[in-house]
Amino acid sequence: MVTSVYKDTATFDSKKLLSSGASVMYDSNGDIMYTYGSQENGTRKNVTYDDLPQVLVDAIVAAEDSRFFEHNGFDLPRIVKAALSNLKAGDITGGGSTITQQLIKKTYFPDAQRTYSRKFSEIILAIQADKALSKEEILTLYLNKIYFGRSTSSIGIAAATKYYFNKDVSELTLPEAAMLAGSLNSPYNYDPYYCLNNATERRNTILNLMVKHGYITQKECDDAKNVKVENMLCSSKITNSSVNAAYVDIVTDEVKKRTGLDPLKTQMNIYTYCNSETQALAAAIGNGEKI
């Protein structure tokens, strides 16, 4: 079985890890009407490692993979612990994935079901990635690809930082970085615009982990906890574009049903019968504007 899975594992290609773009939705004229994971209908912005403040790197590592800079792509103790939990549950309830494995999953298996063979393939590719790339490169690729909330405008660290705080990644503070790191475990449930209490508790958990791993002092932790999450957020959500969000949601759901793929995870071009001018007019009327 192991030999079979190894043969079936995709060939590692570092170029495939690049977040070169996002799924794009086109209107009836063939014009771009919506770009997933971007701000103001632009292209998804990728950051470099030099753009990342140390406080963000520390928060992400503390939250997702405390031995990230030490292991070779997968963490054996975590894998063993996860395997025991899965055996006890009688199902694959958790994978103990490292940051490198998460990057591989997002790239090679974005919509795949949890299976032991897929997990094995994930580990093989993660080890290959760790040999081919530096830790800094892996972390940067990961942060450019992952999503941080419910909105399509929170995919990738640059878009998420703009969406929540309306600032550049390099300007992130400790409490902001901890909040973003905390969302990765469950972006849907830790989106502060929808689940403020959950997001606050999770952020504080990450701050505690940062103390545990020696990244910050207890005083720095306490000071960061005193900053209310609601006071860090933009006064209003920065939307992707002026297109009718309901229409985008309907089309997105239809794409998922027809293809079994999620445009948030798998890059694709989506062509619709939407008349953008009509949609803009409807949105204006809905906002009470005079036509």
How would you describe each model-predicted region?
Residues T48-I99, T152-A158:
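Flexible, acidic/glycine-enriched loop-and-adjacent beta/alpha segments
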Residues M1-S28, I32-M33, L87:
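N-terminal type II signal-anchor transmembrane helix
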